[in-house]
Structures are given as C-alpha cells and as structure tokens.
Amino acid sequence: MPFKVGESLKYIAEFNFIPVGQAELYVTGIEQINGNDAYHVSFSANTKGLANQLFPIQDRIDIWMDTKEFFTHRLTKDINEGNCKNSVDVIFDYDKFVAKTETKEVAIDFKARDSFSMFYYLRTIPIKENEVMSFSSYEGRKIVHYNLQMTGKETVNSPLGTFSCKVIRPFSDGKNLFKNAGDMQIWISDDNERLPVKIQIKMKFGSMMLLLKKVS
C-alpha cells in the first residue's frame, strides 16, 4: 500500500500560475460509514497574503473511501472561492443503490469515485500507458461518467525534488474533460511510492496547480 493513515502531503498552491497559498491532503484515520470501514481523507486549500485579500480561497473537501476498493462512501465539500460559496454532503448507500443529500436521493448503479478517491485508487494499481479507465461520480448536482488515461511520462520539478511521473488525464469521447469545476489532472511519481507530485484542479475562476513540497 503506497499510503497509510497519517500520511500528509503538503503542496505549494499556484492560482493561474501565481503562487497564492498552500494545500494539504491528509489521511486522518479509518471510520465507519453505513457499517463499512473507510479511510477519511481531508483536502484543504487556502490563500495567503495579498492573494487572500484579492481573491480569498478557503476550501475543504472530505471523503470517506472504502479501505479495500477505494470507492467513495461519503463526500463533503465546503467551498469558499471569492464570492462563490458552496457546501454539500453526499452519503452513498450501496445496499439501496442511492446517493443521499440533505434535500434529495439519486438512484445509482455504480460505485462512485470522486476526484480524490479516484486519485488514491490510482496509487494502488499498475497504470499502463494508453489504457482507458472508466469511472462515475456524484457530488450533489448530477451524475458524471468520465474516463482517465495515462498519456505518457513527464519530468516534474517540485519543491521536494525532480520526479519522473506518469501523466493521468481525463477525457470524454476523445475530448479533454478538463472544463468543469473539480476536474483534475495528476502527475504520479513512477516509483513504488506513487506520490501525487503535481495536481492541476479546475476551479470556477481559473486553474489551481499544486506542487508537492513535503511528505510526512
């Protein structure tokens, strides 16, 4: 297993290629959701200094993913980007084939993988170049079906060092899927640790780039 409870990945955050703050992915522990053991993973991103005055970002996303198959059991979001605010809490009941929010239930026939549970899942499997992987997710608005593909390798320079990385890109029907808030591209180190060295996340008003600076 390339990660474990207590793993902290800290990043320098760039917004539209300008350094603006920091972000962290942290595996906080194992908890039970609907009677299932799940890794609780927290993602936080926040701006600092002048960037925080011009366009403050204070985002927190928590997921609870299955400890064996790494699909999502629960997802919460607290998004604060400038004047844009959004919160959601989705619980997946796979025995009843529904995803529940505070206001509605949506029928599902898949094991959901949001951006972050998908990303941890990718760390646990061998990834072959040009192989297409298909996933589905629901984050409170609509069901999204998406594909991922390793398109090659790139050398990435980060504050932690230089890494040879596999590049994982989303697409749909041959087109780039990197157009909706929450879509991401990932550069995973081509070694046993499979570290997410670089993450690019599409946000409402631009693109946030995360570059790995510390692992603990």
Per-segment meaning from a language model:
Residues 1-92, 127-216:
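Acidic, serine/threonine-rich low-complexity disordered tracts
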Residues 81-125:
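Hydrophobic, well-structured mid-protein blocks that either form specific transmembrane helices
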